[in-house]
Amino acid sequence: MRNTFIVCWQYLRAFALIYLCLLAGNAVSALLPFTIPGSIIGMLVLFTLLASQILPAQWVKPGCYLLIRHMALLFVPIGVGVMNYYDLVNQQFGPIVVSCLISTFIVMLVVGFSTQIMQRERATAGDRTPPKDNE
């Protein structure tokens, strides 16, 4: 019974922290003079808290695993909602495809160049060998 309470507490804590980051992102988004979705800002808040180790990753892991496991199911309402705008999507299909292709190409270029830079720096760092002691 105690183990069940611990597991429930871990899930509750994980979802509460994720939701608090979402609320913080929505609050910041409302204060900004330009439009950035609150969910994006909330993810950046969560990332910052995790990267700076203010928030232990173990606290949000159970909730993240559960959300990732059921991610396909979570996209169904969005897909159904898009069908309400079928005529608009059909009219704008060309620009949508072109923007998807261009953004995919840009992401591939950025990732490729970033990988090359990181590999070059790793090779340079690997070349530096400590001097051997002559005994």
Curated annotation (Swiss-Prot):
The keyword Cell membrane applies. Belongs to the UPF0299 family. GO terms for cellular component: plasma membrane. This is UPF0299 membrane protein ECA2828. HAMAP family: UPF0299. It is a multi-pass membrane protein. Keywords: Cell inner membrane, Cell membrane, Membrane, Transmembrane, Transmembrane helix. It is found in: Cell inner membrane. The chain crosses the membrane at residues 5-25, 30-50, 63-83, 93-113.
